[in-house]
From Swiss-Prot:
Region described as G3: spans on this chain: 370-373
Organism: Ruthia magnifica subsp. Calyptogena magnifica
GO molecular function: GTP binding; GTPase activity; translation initiation factor activity
The gene coding this protein: infB
GO terms for cellular component: cytosol
Protein name (database record): Translation initiation factor IF-2
Region ranges (G2): 349-353
G4: annotated span: 424-427
Biological function: One of the essential components for the initiation of protein synthesis. Protects formylmethionyl-tRNA from spontaneous hydrolysis and promotes its binding to the 30S ribosomal subunits. Also involved in the hydrolysis of GTP during the formation of the 70S ribosomal complex.
Domain tr-type G stretches: 315-482
Residues holding GTP: 324-331, 370-374, 424-427
Domain of life: Bacteria
Transmembrane segments: none
Entry's localization field: Cytoplasm
Similarity comment: family membership: Belongs to the TRAFAC class translation factor GTPase superfamily. Classic translation factor GTPase family. IF-2 subfamily.
Length: 815
């Protein structure tokens, strides 16, 4: 049993603190009341106690008069100390120290004996455990040897069984005549049956020919096809895309069977159609085979593996994205930080492109990315969240948390990047910051002063209040997270924006994320590639190179890439062309697969859409990101009755080719921040093509909504204006059947729509042809008045029927 300081203090009749002090004086530190005391430490403790007891006996002498102690002082004088007499007897006082010393000695001896006994028990347990381990090891070795012997015996038995048929065959072969032995050895299975082996001119005897014929028949029967007893299960490796015929070959089945399974799954395909990996795996499992998803190593994968950055990483500036709802002051806040006036140059005062800038703050460089807040630019915000290190979520203090604020929070949480909330417009009156914090907390964005981990800083983009605190928070976050990247390597990055600019060509805004981008490098972005001809920073300065976290404009690509495409620098133009061609081929294959995936479904959809009105649109925008956002927004306007179809989209001005395509497809041409040239305008006038120009995205969307609303069928509603009950029916050769009625409710008007009800069931619906009061034709009859009603093209009216007079009202519908 291991002793602790607590148990030893009870044995020694001392406090735990005294025992700890004695151990510390003896050189054993770091003990507390629950610390275990080893045997060696117990010996040290006992030794210290013995020394203390002996020193006390030598220093003190007990007498009836008190305690005397003598010691030599520095001057050699003797000092005598007398203890005050106690009320107890002198005998008890003299015996007390001796009793204490004896008790200590006894306790020490007991503790030492207990320690020795514990050590002996531990040694005995260790010896017993070692003996058990040795026995287990011996038993395991014996068992292993027995298993090995059994396996050898089984193997010998199998060999004997395998040799037995061979011996029987050999015995049978030996019993045959010599001329018939070994006639079927080797590959000579087509030996002539009626010719002797050694003499071709001599025929075999009839008996020998019969035996040889039987042997050949047996041999042929052994090699004949036999139907499998159990179904053969294949393991099918399936790539990302596979043809139906190829899949059937891998499963060793007919292509028609595969088509039947596909049809049962609701997929209409032909033999040469390409299906995706998931569909193919379902088909394989449905047909009883095992499917394995195989990932082919493509040219692109090999290139990316080769370009993986390796080397010493160095600190880089943080990339900060500003996100939030439209008109919450994102660009205005960035303007104050940059001391610029960007919002003055934006149409409608809202951001419609991704802007990237670098700012110096207290000697530190920070890269800012400004994103649009309009709902149509959701993809832009998503791309920015994935390309950033820190997100500044701007929330207007007077407006609170809005839909795009919540959407931005979801993008940030999906990307897993740190977030700082800037509560803007605190210079306005009547704001409630705590309410904003409470609403944000419902979306798992909890302020630090509420026990969360998100810094929330009140700022004003108008007065500049709190901006310094916001910059300090960014610098602190960057210092804690230690953002770094490899500098000396081929550059990698992300396309932020791309456009076609007159006089400059294809201009691509990229964010360098690792490596160094140099002028003259071979760059690939999406489907486009080319040599870097010029690098320009956010201030318009031409650079020779760009390092990580720098946003730059690059000239030299073969086309305009899509926003969000990965940028790679390769060592040769041949490799760049090879990767670009591979990506284009893969994209064409995906588009073809998409078109051929369900032809029957498309056919049925077209039949259903025969009554659907369609607005064809040809869209041209200034940058690729805006074009993508507009396409998504326009297609989102489609309903069951009216839809928008973007027949073509692109970047750059509107040209003559666009007008020709619009005339052919009867499309409306929409230009976003672009204009048509003179030739295009003339062609549009001749062809009757309508061109609309826009600089604000929601104006474009509202106009398209208005056009679609004009295509919607009006909403019809019915208004009952009167009810009359039929009292009698008069027959007239000239007028036909006339119903004598009493108007019970409302007004009955001539030339109105009516319903004839019998027992509350509609039996006829038509027009009220004639209305008479006595012999006079009247236009209307009010409630409580008798009248005669003639119904157009209906002669089965009877007394007791009800005539319901109503009108239909058309209302124009809007989206």
């Amino acid at each position: 049993m291991a002793h602790t300081v607590q148990t030893l203090s009870k044995l020694l009749k001392k406090t735990p603190d005294e025992v700890i002090t004695i151990l510390a004086n003896a050189g054993v530190d770091g003990k507390n009341s629950d610390s275990a005391i080893s045997a060696e430490e117990r010996k040290i403790l006992m030794s210290s106690l013995s020394k203390r007891s002996s020193s006390k006996s030598s220093m003190f002498s007990f007498s009836k008069t008190g305690i005397k102690s003598s010691a030599n002082s520095a001057s050699g004088a003797k000092v005598q100390v007398k203890k005050k007499r106690l009320t107890k007897s002198a005998t008890a006082t003299d015996e007390q120290p001796e009793i204490a010393v004896n008790e200590v000695a006894q306790a020490v001896q007991v503790a030492l004996d207990a320690g020795r006994d514990a050590d002996k028990k531990l040694l005995a347990q260790d010896a017993k455990r070692l003996e058990m381990v040795r026995l287990q090891k011996t038993q395991a070795e014996v068992l292993k040897a027995q298993k090995k012997t059994v396996k050898q015996a089984q193997a010998q038995e199998i060999e004997k069984k395998a040799e037995k048929p061979k011996m029987i065959d050999k015995f049978k072969e030996d019993k045959k005549p010599k001329r018939l032995r070994n006639t079927l050895n080797g590959n000579n299975t087509r030996r002539q049956l009626h010719v002797a082996r050694h003499n071709p001119n001599r025929k075999l005897k009839k008996k020998d020919r019969t035996r040889l014929s039987q042997k050949v028949q047996e041999e042929q029967a052994q090699h004949a096809f036999q139907k499998p007893i159990e179904k053969v299960v294949h393991e099918i490796a399936i790539a990302e895309n596979i043809k139906v015929t190829e899949l059937a070959q891998k499963m060793a089945t007919k292509a028609g069977e595969v088509l039947k399974v596909l049809m049962g799954m609701g997929v209409m395909a032909t033999l040469n159609d390409v299906i995706d990996q998931d569909t193919a795996m379902l088909v394989v499992e449905e047909m009883g085979h095992k499917s394995i998803a195989s990932v082919e190593e493509t040219v692109e994968d090999v290139l990316i593996e080769q370009l993986k950055s390796s080397g010493n990483e160095k600190a880089r500036p943080p990339v900060v994205t500003i996100m939030g709802h439209v008109d919450h002051g994102k660009t205005s806040l960035l303007d104050y930080i940059r001391q610029a006036k960007v919002t003055h140059g934006e149409a409608g005062g809202i951001t419609q492109h991704i802007g990237a800038y670098q700012v110096q703050s207290n000697g530190n460089t920070i890269t800012f990315i400004d994103t649009p807040g309009h709902a149509a630019f959701s993809k832009m915000r998503s791309r920015s969240a994935n390309a950033t290190d820190i997100v500044i979520l701007v929330v207007a203090a007077d407006d609170g948390v809005m839909p795009q604020t919540i959407e931005s929070i979801k993008h940030v949480q999906t990307a897993g990047v740190p977030m700082i909330v800037a509560i803007n417009k605190i210079d306005k009156e009547g704001i409630d910051i705590d309410k904003i914090k409470q609403v944000l907390s419902t979306h798992n964005v909890i302020s630090e002063d509420w026990g969360g981990d998100v810094m929330m800083i009140p700022v004003s983009a108008y007065t500049g209040e709190g901006v310094d605190a916001l910059l300090d928070a960014i610098s602190l976050t960057a210092e804690v997270l230690e953002f770094s990247a490899v500098i000396k390597a081929l550059a990698r990055g992300t396309v932020l924006e791309a456009r076609l600019e007159k006089g400059r060509g294809k201009v691509t805004t990229i964010l360098v994320q690792s490596g160094t981008l140099n002028k003259g490098d071979i760059m690939i972005a999406g489907f486009e590639y080319g040599k870097v001809k010029q690098i320009v920073d956010d201030k318009g300065k031409v650079l020779k190179s760009a390092t990580p976290s720098m946003p730059v404009e690059v000239l030299g690509l073969s086309g305009v890439p899509n926003s969000g495409d990965e940028v790679l620098v390769v060592d040769s133009e041949r490799k760049a062309r090879e990767v670009a061609d591979f990506r284009k081929a893969k994209n064409r294959e995906a588009q073809l697969q998409k078109q051929q995936a369900s032809k029957m479904e498309n056919f049925l959809m077209k039949m259903e859409e025969s009554n659907v009105s369609t607005v064809n649109v040809l869209l041209k925008a200034d940058v690729r990101g805006s074009a993508q956002a507009l396409i998504e927004a326009l297609e989102g306007l489609s309903t069951d009755e009216a839809k928008v179809k973007v027949v073509s989209s692109g970047v750059g001005g509107i040209n003559n080719t666009d007008i020709t395509l619009a005339a052919t497809s009867n499309a409306l041409v929409l230009g976003f921040n672009v204009r048509a040239d003179a030739v295009a305008r003339k062609t549009a006038d001749n062809e009757g093509v309508r061109i609309e120009y826009y600089s604000i995205i929601y104006n474009l969307i509202d106009d398209v909504k208005t056009i679609m609303s004009g295509l919607l069928s009006p909403e019809l509603s019915e208004n009952i204006i009167g009810i009359a009950s039929v009292k009698s029916v008069f027959r007239s050769q000239k007028m036909g059947d006339i119903a004598g009625c009493m108007v019970e409710e409302g007004v009955v008007r001539r030339d109105s729509l009516i319903r004839v009800l019998r027992d509350s069931v509609v039996i006829f619906e038509g027009w009220l042809e004639s209305l008479r009061r006595f012999k006079d034709n009247v236009n209307e009859v009010k409630s409580g008045t008798e009248c005669g009603i003639g119904v157009l093209n209906y002669t089965d009216i009877q007394p007791g029927d009800q005539i319901e007079v109503f009108e239909r009202i058309e209302r124009i519908r809007t989206l």
